[in-house]
Amino acid sequence: LLAADRPETDRPANRILDIDNPWARVKAHLLCGLGSALRCQCILLATPQPGTRIHVFGYASDLERTDVLYASVLIQMWHGLAGAQVPAWCRSARAWRRSWLLGFATAVISRVRAAEHAAACRATGPEAAAGSRTALVLADRSHVVRAEAERAYPLTRTARVTYSGSGYRDGYAEGQRADIGTGRVTRGRGRALTRAS
C-alpha cells in the first residue's frame, strides 16, 4: 500500500545475475522459483561462460526479499546436502545429489508460494481494513513486472526441470524443514547474488 500511495518508495527494477557452478541450473531453479513466488519474473539467458545468467524483473522490495531468502535457503540447502548420505546401492552419486537438491528446492518454493498466498488472502480478506485496495495494488504490481519482462523479451519459452536419481524424496523432506522466515521480517544488506558485469 505504501508503494501505491508513494510510488517513489518502491519502483520496478531489474538486474542481470550470474549463477556460478557447481549446480548452477539447480540454483537457478531455486532463485527463479522463489522470485516467482515473490512476484518477480526471471528470464534465463544464454551465456558462453560456465554457469547460468538470469535477468530478474520485479519491484525493488520484492527483488530484495528474493535475494535475502535465496541466500538463506542456499546455505541451508548446502548444509543439508553435506549431511545427506548417498545410499550404497546408488549407481550415480552425482545424479542422486542433483535430485536431492531439486527436491529440496521444490519443497521450499512450494512453501514460500503457499505462505505468500496466505499473506495475500489475509491482506485482501473482508476483515482487512484496506482489503480491496491491497488486492488492486498486488495485481497492478504483478502486471507491471510481467509487462517489463515481456517488453525486454517478447519471445520466451518455459524451461523444464528434469532429474534422474532417487534423492528427490529425501531432499524434499529436508526442504519441508527449511527455515523460510515465515512469520517474521528478514532484512539483509549483503548481496548473495553476483551481478553480471
Enumerate the language-model features and the residues they cover.
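Extended, helix-rich structural scaffolds rather than catalytic motifs
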Residues: 3-197
